[in-house]
Design a protein with these regions (language model features):
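Primary mode marks residue(s) on the alpha4-beta5-alpha5 output face of response regulator receiver
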Residues: 1-232
């Protein structure tokens, strides 16, 4: 019936908090009932903590845009509105890999303006900042993507770099229609379809046609993650 969210996925994350995951706790029930919902956390910090993932009905024409009045406003677009006021906005010096803070925030999420190379606008949990900072410096040194990943893996194994926590959420926005335009990514290191009950069958084509559902990528690896396309 239409008086409740009709298609809802629930991801259990016992004892997780908004800070540890990087997700809002503002209910999206009303928005979801209108076919425009976003994931949100319920019962944070308890054994019953979970993320509600409403699957919006198919959209024939997306209303998603990555355009904004200025660089800071544009960087914040992937986030739900309640997380935007406190988010840090930054970018990297491509020659040195040093972090350049455009706006210092007080929240647990930070965003980067649209990348001129790949066109993506990204927001991430601050807990993963050391990994991104290290990667940026290695790229500035001319390291390949494979070399960067190897260095991150080695540092993690050595204990000098903390692994990405299970359940960490990141956000990605893309302005053109040849890719998934609004995508949330939930890191689930080591997870498999059997351990979390999520299909590994890609939903890219469905998402591009406005009817995407979550799916698991890189199952059973440290980089395992759930792709959550947002139909809007």
């Amino acid at each position: 019936k239409a008086d409740r969210i009709q298609d809802l996925w629930v991801m259990s994350l016992p004892n997780a908090t908004p800070e540890s995951v990087g997700v809002s706790t503002v209910s999206q029930r009303d928005a979801a009932l209108k076919g425009n919902g976003l994931p949100w956390m319920m019962l944070p910090g308890t054994p019953g903590a979970h993320i509600m993932i409403p699957i919006n009905p198919m959209v024939k024409s997306s209303t998603i845009s990555d355009q904004a009045a200025d660089e800071i406003a544009q960087a914040l677009l992937p986030l739900p509105e309640d997380l935007r006021p406190t988010a840090t906005v930054y970018k990297y010096d491509r020659k040195t890999g040093e972090r350049i803070v455009l706006r210092k925030g007080t929240g647990y999420v930070e965003c980067m303006p649209r990348d001129p190379e790949d066109g993506f606008t990204r927001c991430m949990n601050v807990v993963s900042a050391p990994r991104r900072d290290m990667a940026a410096k290695l790229k500035a040194q001319g390291k390949s993507e494979a070399e960067v990943n190897e260095a991150l893996a080695a540092a993690t194994k050595a204990g000098t770099l903390k692994p990405t926590p299970f359940g960490t959420l990141s956000y990605r926005l893309y302005g053109k229609k040849d890719r998934i335009q609004l995508l949330w990514v939930l890191s689930v290191p080591g997870a498999t379809p059997e351990s979390i009950g999520v299909s590994a069958a890609p939903q890219r084509d469905n998402a591009l046609s406005g009817n995407g559902r979550p799916w698991l990528m890189l199952p059973g690896t440290p980089g395992a993650h759930i792709m959550i396309p947002i139909n809007r």
